Amino acid sequence: MKTPLTEAVSAADSQGRFLSSTAVQVAFGRFRQATSGLAAAKALSEKADSLASGARNAVYSKFPYTTSMTGANYASTQTGKDKCVRDIGYYIRMVTYCCVVGGTGPMDDYLVAGIAEINRTFDLSPSWYVEALKYVKANHGLSGDSAVEANSYIDYAINALS
């Protein structure tokens, strides 16, 4: 999994050199930032169920037709509604992973690379997940550096879907 720190170490190692002073400063900056990222990940994890449920309702409010579309991938049944919450929870989980590692590596590796194909295969609209992520961003209750950290990865996911 790629993070700014693992990339710096990998580059230095492949060139047979020590980390540059700039890379070391980046590492110290990440360690200072880590507290905020871990706090954001903890708070989002604790609120994941309620955030996912609220985000689902925000999607249904903006796109009411999704609750009447029939099929295994839509919200006309309880199974469809449960899948929606599960999928939104997956996005929240990816944001928490990014907060922990301090980079977009988890999202790049496990979400962004195949999201267009998944959405196309299951006839899912990226705009639904964009709306869900906007809800999460507006309602996560974080503040200060923790909010900045989480919001940057939420925005990254939104941009990947757009």
From Swiss-Prot:
Contains one covalently linked bilin chromophore. GO terms for cellular component: phycobilisome; plasma membrane-derived thylakoid membrane. The keyword Thylakoid applies. Keywords: Antenna complex, Bile pigment, Chromophore, Electron transport, Membrane, Photosynthesis, Phycobilisome, Thylakoid, Transport. InterPro entries: Globin-like_sf, Phycobilisome_asu/bsu, Phycobilisome_asu/bsu_sf, Phycocyanin_a. Its main location: membrane. It comes from the Bacteria. CDD domains: PC-PEC_alpha. It is found in: Cellular thylakoid membrane. Light-harvesting photosynthetic bile pigment-protein from the phycobiliprotein complex (phycobilisome, PBS). Phycocyanin is the major phycobiliprotein in the PBS rod. PANTHER family: C-PHYCOCYANIN ALPHA SUBUNIT, PHYCOBILISOME 32.1 KDA LINKER POLYPEPTIDE, PHYCOCYANIN-ASSOCIATED, ROD 2-RELATED. NCBIfam families: phycocy_alpha (TIGR01338). Heterodimer of an alpha and a beta subunit, which further assembles into trimers and the trimers into hexamers. This is C-phycocyanin-1 alpha subunit. It comes from Pseudanabaena tenuis (strain PCC 7409).
